[in-house]
């Protein structure tokens, strides 16, 4: 292994909200009894760098174990289904820091007096030093955990805003300008962890949960700042089928699978669901991108919004409220029997075991469709009014970018110009503006110039109008050849080039 290898691994596609699960998975697997974890975001050592701290009060590692855990040629341990201290840990360290920013691991067994500390970046040879003082004591020694004494393991990484911003989306797209404060990251990671670790964070009948994840200095929705424990997030239903129990035989093993599906109660699920009283941003939005079921491996949610990977159905607005959980009991399965992608960021569809499970689910459990589909009907009536008032040709659910997204209502003004209309039954946010722009760019690429793009919604934030104004001051995206032709027509006057014309409109008549 050379230094070039470390750089290559650091550039893999792994959003930070998935990479950051690795320390938590390690903590869950390397603890005896109740799990106590901490995740903090602090200013980095330089401007525009952000520090992320994880700590736990579990079993820790001795000097041999920490040395082994950082060896790229070594495999993870077999302790538990989440495994510990393997390639995933190194993935996290490299992806977070891009192998150019500081990191360290300090760990010890509970009975040891000093920490075994390793500083990054990675090199072919690295030193382990001993340290008796608790690293970052002012951050990790919070009042809630002081009775537990010193942490067993502390991991610190620094990242730039581009990397940090991949926590703020589901697909890992990069938008460093969105990292406006550390609390944006705290709120986002609370949502991701609240979904992925909900079964660990859910209190039992006595009020105690198997695991706690503390986030220090968290700004609540009411403006108060305090240390808080991550809240588990479960979808809530307005209609649900009974749980079906399947036994899937594959490769000599009977795999117990439980399936629950139904229709999402979007308003009840989203309202104050995230730690601190915030609404959901990434999950259970009641739209096409979040429709589908969660995949649960043991107690860990490893994938959400699964639809066409299981059923032979394309995403469609009538499935916007379709949700549920496929839970796989892995207690009697060998370690690694069902493969996942790096850091359990998703299912590995090349593993035939998953195909066997999904085929069994598809045969036994139908997709639940919202037959009323009130928003789609509302859009249909809107389209009819356009045709009656203007005589223009209108298309519903128009596919853009080879069916990767759809426009609710597309009005053809003539052969070369159109108006775009989209509808949503929940509050509009920055994603709504991004969706409008995606639809605009898609029509441009398909040879039809939009004149306007409007999103009708039940409510919107105060800054969305300003965001639209900023975008509307920009020249639209287009290929170089089209830009060259447009400049020629405009005789070099950029003011005459096609600009965006996006608008978010509140329509109180929209069905909710």
Predicted regions and their residues:
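Charged regulatory segments coupled to nucleotide-binding catalytic modules in large multidomain enzymes
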Residues: 239-381, 385, 389, 403
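Acidic ATP/Mg2+-coordinating residue in the GHKL
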Residues: 56
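Bergerat-fold ATP-binding/catalytic subdomain of histidine kinases
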Residues: 68-81
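Nucleic-acid nuclease catalytic cores
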Residues: 99-114, 424-425, 441-488
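Glycine-rich G1-box
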Residues: 59-60
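Active-site metal-binding core of divalent-cation-utilizing nuclease and nuclease-like domains
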Residues: 308, 387-415, 427-430
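GHKL-type ATPase core
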Residues: 80-218
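Bergerat-fold GHKL ATPase/HATPase_c domain
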Residues: 1-43, 47, 64-70, 338, ...
């Amino acid at each position: 292994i050379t230094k070039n290898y470390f750089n290559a691994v650091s550039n893999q596609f792994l959003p930070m909200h998935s990479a950051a699960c690795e320390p938590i998975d390690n903590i869950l697997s390397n603890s005896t009894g109740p799990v106590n974890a901490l995740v903090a975001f602090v200013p980095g050592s330089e401007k525009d760098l952000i520090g992320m701290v994880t700590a736990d009060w579990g079993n820790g590692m001795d000097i041999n174990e920490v040395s082994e855990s950082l060896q790229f040629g070594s495999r993870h341990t077999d302790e538990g289904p989440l495994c510990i201290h393997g390639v995933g840990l190194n993935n996290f360290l490299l992806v977070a820091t891009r192998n150019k920013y500081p990191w360290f691991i300090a760990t010890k067994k509970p009975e040891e007096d000093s920490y075994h500390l390793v500083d990054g970046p990675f090199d072919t040879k690295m030193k382990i030093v001993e340290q008796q003082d608790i690293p970052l004591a002012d951050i990790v020694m919070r009042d809630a955990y002081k009775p537990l004494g010193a942490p067993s393991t502390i991991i610190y990484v620094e990242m730039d805003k581009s990397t940090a911003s991949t926590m703020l989306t589901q697909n890992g797209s990069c938008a460093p300008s969105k990292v406006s404060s550390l609390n944006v990251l705290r709120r986002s990671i609370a949502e991701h962890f609240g979904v992925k670790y909900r079964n660990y964070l859910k209190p039992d009948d006595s009020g105690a949960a198997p695991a706690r994840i503390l986030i220090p200095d968290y700004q609540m929705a009411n403006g108060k700042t305090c240390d808080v424990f991550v809240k588990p997030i479960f979808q809530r239903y307005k209609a649900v089928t009974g749980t079906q129990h399947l036994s899937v035989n594959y490769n000599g093993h009977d795999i117990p699978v439980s399936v629950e599906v139904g229709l999402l109660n979007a308003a009840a699920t989203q309202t104050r669901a995230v730690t601190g009283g915030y609404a959901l941003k990434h999950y259970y939005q009641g739209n096409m991108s979040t429709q589908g079921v969660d995949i649960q491996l043991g107690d860990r949610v490893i994938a959400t919004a699964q639809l066409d990977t299981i059923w032979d159905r394309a995403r469609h607005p009538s499935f916007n409220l379709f949700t549920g959980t496929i839970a796989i009991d892995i207690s009697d399965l060998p370690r690694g029997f069902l493969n996942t992608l790096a850091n359990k960021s998703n299912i590995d569809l090349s593993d035939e075991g998953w195909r066997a499970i999904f085929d069994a689910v598809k045969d036994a459990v139908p997709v639940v469709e919202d037959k009323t589909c009130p928003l789609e009907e509302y859009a249909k009536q809107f389209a009819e009014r356009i045709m009656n008032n203007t005589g223009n040709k209108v298309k519903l659910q128009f596919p853009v970018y080879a069916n990767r997204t759809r426009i609710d209502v597309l009005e053809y003004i003539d052969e070369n110009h159109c108006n775009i209309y989209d509808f949503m039954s929940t509050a509009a946010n920055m994603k709504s503006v991004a969706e409008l722009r995606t639809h605009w760019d898609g029509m441009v690429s398909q040879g039809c110039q939009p004149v306007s793009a409007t999103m009708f919604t039940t409510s919107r934030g105060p800054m969305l109008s300003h965001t639209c104004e900023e975008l509307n001051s920009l020249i639209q995206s287009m290929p170089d050849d089209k830009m060259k032709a447009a400049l020629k027509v405009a005789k070099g006057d950029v003011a005459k080039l096609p600009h965006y014309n996006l608008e978010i409109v509140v329509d109180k008549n929209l069905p909710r």
